[in-house]
Design a protein with these regions (language model features):
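Functional cores of ribonucleases/endoribonucleases
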Residues: 51-134
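Intrinsically disordered, low-complexity and often Lys/Arg-enriched segments
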Residues: 1, 134-135
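N-terminal "domain-start" segment
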Residues: 1-63
Length: 135
């Protein structure tokens, strides 16, 4: 069927992935981060730094950029995991839910690459805790 051809195109299949990781590269570069950065939109829309009024996520992006930079420079010891041309690590950040008063500690995962030097990008997303088993 002709109308199904669009689903076979590579660009159409990747559009959902592109929408799930918002490009915050200009903001990260203002904080001195050297790579392109993409952060899960749920993280930016739901959380902010503790005791900071941050409507657009500017300070949250800056804090994440500083943490990732500290891990790469060795100032924040973390175990780096190789994913082929990419390296990844987990880290924690203290944030506050936009609609709650209590601070929370979130577990985030960052993957940086490709490590061959072309168009480096850092991808950051929230690690969801496992849900309770249904039984």
């Amino acid at each position: 069927m002709k109308h199904n051809r669009i689903f076979r195109r590579r660009s159409y299949r990747l559009s959902a992935l592109r929408a799930s990781l918002r490009d915050v590269t200009p903001t990260a570069r203002q904080w001195g981060f050297p790579f392109a950065m993409r952060i899960q939109p749920k993280l930016l829309s739901t959380f902010t730094l503790v005791n900071v009024v941050d409507d657009e996520g500017y300070y949250l992006v800056g804090r994440i950029a500083l943490l990732v930079d500290a891990v790469l420079q060795g100032r924040l010891p973390r175990r780096l995991v190789s994913h082929g041309n990419y390296i990844g690590f987990n880290f924690r950040i203290t944030v506050q839910h936009r609609r709650k008063d209590a601070p929370e500690i979130l577990e985030l995962e960052a993957v940086i690459g490709p490590c061959d030097g072309r168009r480096l990008a850092a991808y950051v997303w929230l690690i969801e805790p496992p849900s309770d088993p249904p039984f």
